[in-house]
Swiss-Prot record:
PANTHER family: SERINE/THREONINE-PROTEIN PHOSPHATASE 2A REGULATORY SUBUNIT B, SERINE_THREONINE-PROTEIN PHOSPHATASE 2A ACTIVATOR 2. The lineage of its organism: Eukaryota, Fungi, Dikarya, Ascomycota, Saccharomycotina. Transmembrane segments: none annotated. This is Serine/threonine-protein phosphatase 2A activator 2. Coiled coil: none annotated.
């Protein structure tokens, strides 16, 4: 078998259409829905039987955090955009991934190559120094591949409540250290500068809660009390802590609107549909989606692009993918504490999603 890396194959609207009707898309989306299902009504502290691979995955993510400490930004105030040391961190991540992941089980060389490719791509783009829902999707693909290989049991909540929670913690450390730019620059019009899935999984966790309601995200005491137990509450608390304006209505109007939904179950249903429509069906995101032997390209999509050619990205709007550089909320918050407040530089006129 070939030991080539997974490659991009969705290069045109026609490719996207083929992918949308494919078994591969159904399998990946189905995997996300299974993960969502198994955390309904369960907080982060929920006790569940954990396969040994769960602890190994957490240990790997801890090693990623250790790498952040080894490659600190030399100048924390030189720019409000991404820190170039991220490239050194990412190179070290790629160099170490094989040794880390080979410990997960008996893997053939090609399987290890594919797992490492999705894993490394889960932490942002080394060239653009950015991160978005497409990179988060790569982590889901990494877990999906482990499931395909029979190494990960998803019929429990541990894949989300232990592994994904640790991944989110790891990404927050990476984002805070290197000020990764939001991929797509959705800014205030999206759910979050970086992530989507914590809101989906988090709303599933709260679907059966006795007294917490969607409107509870406006109660600072509730957020502080439950930020470690529920992903959704933790994300709102985090957003409030880094945004440079005080009101959720101002800095995150979509989240504010969603808080008006009557039940968390309805919120979760909407999040699942939104993930399908705004992540798994958008060309600016899926043009970076990679296919190999574990995640097979649908028949009829474009052949892989020339690896020596410059990557051409398709943009539906001016801020898609890698269009306009916009600082992260973390960067804006940090810089607003410095002389020459930069908070007014943050854009607020971007249309929602792609």
């Amino acid at each position: 078998m070939s030991h080539s890396h997974p490659v991009r194959r969705i290069l045109s609207p026609k490719d996207l259409e083929i992918f949308g009707a494919s078994d591969t898309k159904k399998q990946v989306f189905g995997f996300v829905k299974v993960l969502n299902y198994y955390v309904v009504g369960k907080g982060n502290s929920y006790e569940t039987l954990k396969h040994p691979i769960i602890g190994k995955l957490v240990a790997i993510l801890d090693k990623v955090i250790d790498l952040v400490a080894k490659y600190p930004p030399e100048d924390a105030t030189s720019s409000r955009f991404g820190k170039p040391e991220f490239r050194d961190f990412h190179q070290a991540l790629e160099e170490n991934a094989k040794d880390w992941i080979s410990d997960l089980g008996e893997l053939e060389d090609w399987q290890l190559v594919e797992l490492c490719t999705y894993f490394a791509a889960s932490f942002g783009d080394r060239t653009r120094i950015d991160f978005g829902s497409g990179h988060e999707l790569n982590f889901i693909c990494f877990l999906f591949c482990l499931r395909q290989l029979g190494l990960l049991d998803t019929d429990s909540s541990a894949a989300v409540l232990t592994v994904f929670v640790q991944y989110l913690k790891t990404m927050r450390a990476v984002q805070a250290s290197y000020w990764l730019e939001p991929a797509g620059s959705h800014g205030v019009w999206g759910l979050d500068d970086y992530h989507f899935l914590p809101f989906m999984f988090g709303s599933a966790q709260l679907a059966c809660h006795k007294y917490l309601r969607p409107l509870s995200i406006h109660d600072m005491e509730m957020l502080d009390m439950w930020k470690h137990e529920y992903l959704y509450m933790g994300c709102i608390h985090f957003i409030n802590s880094v945004k440079t304006t005080a009101s959720l209505r101002w800095h995150s109007p979509m989240l504010d609107d969603i808080s008006g939904v009557k039940t968390w179950a309805k919120v979760n249903q909407g999040m699942v549909k939104m993930y399908d429509a705004e992540v798994l069906s958008k060309l600016p995101i899926l043009q970076h989606f990679m296919f190999g032997q574990l995640i097979k390209a649908p028949e009829g999509v474009s052949p892989p692009p020339d690896p020596n050619a410059e990557v051409q990205h398709i943009h539906n709007h001016w801020a898609d993918c890698c269009g306009i550089k916009v600082p992260s909320a973390i960067a804006a918050s940090e810089m607003s504490q410095k002389p020459g407040d930069l908070r007014k530089l943050r854009g607020s006129g971007v249309l929602p999603f792609d």
